[in-house]
Amino acid sequence: ITHTCHGAGGCVGSTGMQRILVLNPKGGSGKTTIATNLASYFASRGDRPLLTDNDPQGSSTRWLKKRKPEQAFIHGIAAFERNSRMTRAWQMRIPTDAAHVVVDTPAAVLAQEMPEITRSADAIIVPVLPSDIDIHAFSKCIADLLLIAKVRRDENRIGVVANRVKRNTVIYQSLMRFLETLRIPVVATLRDSQNYVRAAELGCGLHEMKKYQVEQDLADWEPMLAWLRAKELKEPPQSIDVLPETA
């Protein structure tokens, strides 16, 4: 099986590949944390996922560089970089053994870019923090996905993650009431935990840490992972696109 790229537009891969987009145009919503932990999960179960870092901050790429040789292998593409020694198509090629592609998107993705970004995504994970500012930005993101990218609710491609929550707070209750009105599944509610900080420092994910240390956090992740596993049973789109070129 081969995966060939067509310029900057995208790549064609096997039908067995699952593409997961982690998206929220607002910075600081936890996209990289979710993307790296997803890649870690797939790697820990014996897959060889591809983590594509489209964020100029390069946080996912730095995380990958911290990983030790004995850790489960994760392919990485620093998509935000421009390498003058190779073509863009060669730089963006998708490894033939990558069953999962996790895309860490940058902040400030424009509404008009959403149709191209989301077209071939099997799952679009949208994290949101429990704050008024974040909820407002998240609302616009969801509206853009539904109205501009034309992602239909009945496709069940969008999954919301309530991130860094403290369940006994008023703002958390407000967030959950708001999410209930959207008719879009909340696939995970992740607590505000120092385990994510430790994992980032070590270049690993929760699923690679000692279970007794992260048991509660692993339980938080299980609904989202079950949602993604259910999608693996369905045939994903053939086209695997990268983010559009930026000036």
Could you say what each language-model-derived stretch is?
Residues 1-17, 237-246:
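Acidic-aromatic/histidine active-site loop/patch
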Residues 112-132:
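Inter-motif core of Ras-like GTPase G domains
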